C-alpha cells in the first residue's frame, strides 16, 4: 500500500533558486528508506515539503491519499499527527523534563488551551513511560533534557515522534551530531520501529555506509534531482561517486 506519493515536486526560493526539481517517488507502508546526497542537495527541504513546513512550489505530495499542498490549516494539523519528525539537533525544550518533552508529541490532538496547560490523560502519560522504557531511558523521565547526552536526547525525540501514533516518521540527519556508538543505537532503534511497529521511516543521512546497512531502499539526490532510486545493495561505488563528486572523499562512515 502506498503511504507517501511525491509527484513532480519542485521547490524554489526568490523565484529563481531551485532547490528541488521534478522529484518523483512512492513509498509504501512499513518501508525503511534513506535519502542520501551532498550538502545542499535538497534533502532537508524535501522532508519539509512532505510535512509542509515549507510551501510546495510545484507538483504535489500525498500522504495516506491526502494532498498535503491543498490542505487548509485545520486539516493539515490533523494530518501532521500521522507524520512524526526527528531532527538533527533534537528540537527539544531543554529546561523541561524528558516526560514533558515526550508528551509534547500529543499537542496535535489537543486544543490550544489543553496544550498550554499541559492537560494530558493518564493513558497518554502511561504511553509516554512505555515508550521511554522501550528506548531505555525511563530512568531519566524527570530529568531536564539539557542534562542528557546527545544520544539520550535523540531517543527522547524518537519517543516524542512515536507518541503521536504516526504512520510515517521523517528523520532529518538524526545521527549527524552523535558519536559512532550513539549513532548505532539510534539507527538500531529506528530500524526496530519499522520492523516491529510497521511505521514507515524516511531518513536523511550523510553517511552512505550507514544508509546501505540499514535502509531497504536508497534515494540519491544531487542538485535537487533524484539520480538514484533502488535497493541499497544496488548502490555501487560508481553511483556514489556520481552523487557526491569531489565530496565523496570526505564521506563519514560509522
From Swiss-Prot:
Gene Ontology cellular component terms for the protein in this record: plasma membrane
EC number: 7.3.2.2
Presence of keyword Chaperone: no
Domain of life, per lineage: Bacteria
Record keyword Nucleotide-binding present: yes
InterPro entries in the record: AAA+_ATPase, ABC_transporter-like_ATP-bd, ABC_transporter-like_CS, ABC_transpr_PhnC, MetN_ABC_transporter-like, P-loop_NTPase
Cell location: Cell membrane
Ranges for domain ABC transporter: 4-248
Catalytic activity: phosphonate(out) + ATP + H2O = phosphonate(in) + ADP + phosphate + H(+)
Binding site for ATP: 37-44
Keyword tags: ATP-binding, Cell membrane, Membrane, Nucleotide-binding, Phosphonate transport, Translocase, Transport
A Pfam cross-reference name: ABC_tran
Gene Ontology molecular function, alphabetical: ABC-type phosphonate transporter activity; ATP binding; ATP hydrolysis activity
Predominant subcellular localization, coarse grouping: membrane
Membrane topology: Peripheral membrane protein
Biological role stated in the UniProt entry: Part of the ABC transporter complex PhnCDE involved in phosphonates import. Responsible for energy coupling to the transport system.
Homology family: Belongs to the ABC transporter superfamily. Phosphonates importer (TC 3.A.1.9.1) family.
Subunit structure of this chain's protein: The complex is composed of two ATP-binding proteins (PhnC), two transmembrane proteins (PhnE) and a solute-binding protein (PhnD).
Name this protein carries in UniProt: Phosphonates import ATP-binding protein PhnC 2
Protein source organism: Oceanobacillus iheyensis (strain DSM 14371 / CIP 107618 / JCM 11309 / KCTC 3954 / HTE831)
Gene (name only): phnC2
Amino acid at each position: 500500500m502506498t503511504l507517501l506519493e511525491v509527484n513532480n515536486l519542485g521547490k524554489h526560493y526568490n523565484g529563481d533558486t531551485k532547490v528541488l526539481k521534478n522529484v518523483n517517488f512512492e513509498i509504501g507502508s512499513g518501508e525503511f528508506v534513506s535519502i542520501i546526497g551532498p550538502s545542499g542537495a535538497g534533502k532537508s527541504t524535501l522532508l519539509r515539503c512532505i510535512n509542509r513546513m515549507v510551501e510546495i512550489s510545484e507538483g504535489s505530495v500525498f500522504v495516506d491519499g491526502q494532498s498535503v499542498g491543498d490542505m487548509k490549516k485545520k486539516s493539515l494539523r490533523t494530518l501532521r499527527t500521522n507524520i512524526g519528525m526527528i531532527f538533527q539537533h533534537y528540537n527539544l525544550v531543554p529546561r523541561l523534563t524528558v516526560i514533558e518533552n515526550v508528551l509534547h508529541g500529543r499537542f496535535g490532538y489537543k486544543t490550544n488551551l489543553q496544550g498550554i496547560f499541559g492537560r494530558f490523560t493518564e493513558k497518554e502519560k502511561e504511553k509516554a513511560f512505555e515508550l521511554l522504557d522501550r528506548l531505555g531511558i525511563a530512568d531519566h523521565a524527570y530529568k531536564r533534557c539539557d542534562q542528557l547526552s546527545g544520544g539520550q536526547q535523540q531517543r527522547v525525540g524518537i519517543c516524542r515522534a512515536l507518541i503521536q501514533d504516526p504512520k510515517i516518521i521523517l528523520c532529518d540527519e538524526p545521527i549527524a551530531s552523535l558519536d559512532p556508538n550513539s549513532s548505532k543505537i539510534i539507527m538500531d532503534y529506528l530500524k526496530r520501529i519499522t520492523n516491529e511497529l510497521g511505521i514507515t521511516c524516511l531518513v536523511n543521512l550523510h553517511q552512505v555506509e550507514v544508509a546501505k546497512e540499514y535502509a531497504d531502499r536508497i534515494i540519491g539526490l544531487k542538485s535537487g534531482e533524484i539520480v538514484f532510486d533502488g535497493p541499497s545493495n544496488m548502490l555501487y561505488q560508481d553511483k556514489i561517486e556520481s552523487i557526491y563528486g569531489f565530496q565523496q572523499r570526505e564521506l563519514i562512515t560509522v
